[in-house]
Amino acid sequence: MRILLTGTARCGSTWAANVLGLTDGTKAVFEPDGPASDVLGAMVAARLGSHPALLPEQRSFWYRQLWDVAFVGGWPMARAEGVRAAGRRVSRMPRGLRDGLVVTLAMGTSRLRKRPRNVIVKSVNSTFSLDWIAQRYGPKMVIMRRNPLNIVSSCTVLGLYTKRNIGDLPAVNRRVVVPLGLTTPSGDASPVTRAAWNVGLLTTALRQAADHHPEWVVASHDDLCVDPLPRFEALTRQLGLGWTSAMEEYVTKSDDPNFTVFGGSQRVHPNAATSTTGSSRRSEATTQFTRRLTPAQVAEARSVLAEFPLGDWGPDA
């Protein structure tokens, strides 16, 4: 079985991928399309931008190579750090040599690697190409959503979505921004404004995809935090997977504020002191923005998010 778990950055999808990846016969693949996390992700970003926006009928040799590798279980390395280290070495090669080496390795991996019974691919860069992926690979699609204010607060702390406008990517602008009648933030926009705008854009696109495909699964990070064990078990069974004791153990341990997640570096997935004021991460995760943003910043983020047709995916839903 193939599963694509998608959402914005900081939406809780890493937590979910780690839990679901512990079901029997399952491999979780983290961010194969991330420009900073995978050499194929970097090569795709150089051609299509950080967030590719492909229509189902469009063809892309490099995007196809990326997802071919992802859905057989990713590169044959044990940890994400190994993929990043290898990618950094390869990226320093002359372009012609690098491209030839990477495509040879990618084709060999996708053809020869023995695929696990289940592969869960976790991605935060595929928002605008979900139909393209669904049409070619037929995975079960899972969209992870979260209160956008909590996403904005986390992104602001980590410097994610704060430096450039995703909506300035030509294909994203043409396919999403212009039809929505939106204008991207100016060059002097604050980090909170830019993060909120990018989160609003991505969340809108994810909501539209979910509305267009009622058969896709939508999971709420906020709901999972309220009662993690039974709700994760329900999500697991909804996907046709089996609940295991290892999954229960992970959910329980991950509630510890000192717990470090797997699937990213400490720099990318730190457990900041502002994530909780007590002994439970999940019990306060749904109000995280109140500790990470000032009241003025919350008001600023709300004002930006109000520009988007978020409906019941908005901050006050």
Residue ranges and their predicted role:
Residues 1-4, 180-218, 226-317:
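PAPS-dependent sulfotransferases, especially Golgi type II membrane carbohydrate sulfotransferases
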Residues 5-17:
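Glycine-rich phosphate-binding P-loop
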Residues 6-7, 120-124, 144-146, 220-222:
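Short His-Asn-centered micro-motif
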Residues 14-17, 35-39, 127-130, 149-154, ...:
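Short catalytic/ligand-binding loop motif for oxyanion handling, primarily in non-cytosolic enzymes
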Residues 14-26:
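A conserved segment at the C-terminal end of the G1
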Residues 31-120, 166-186, 282-283:
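PAPS-dependent sulfation machinery
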Residues 122-123, 133-157:
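Conserved phosphate-donor/acceptor-positioning beta-strand/loop module used by diverse small-molecule
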Residues 123-128, 258:
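Short beta->alpha connector loops
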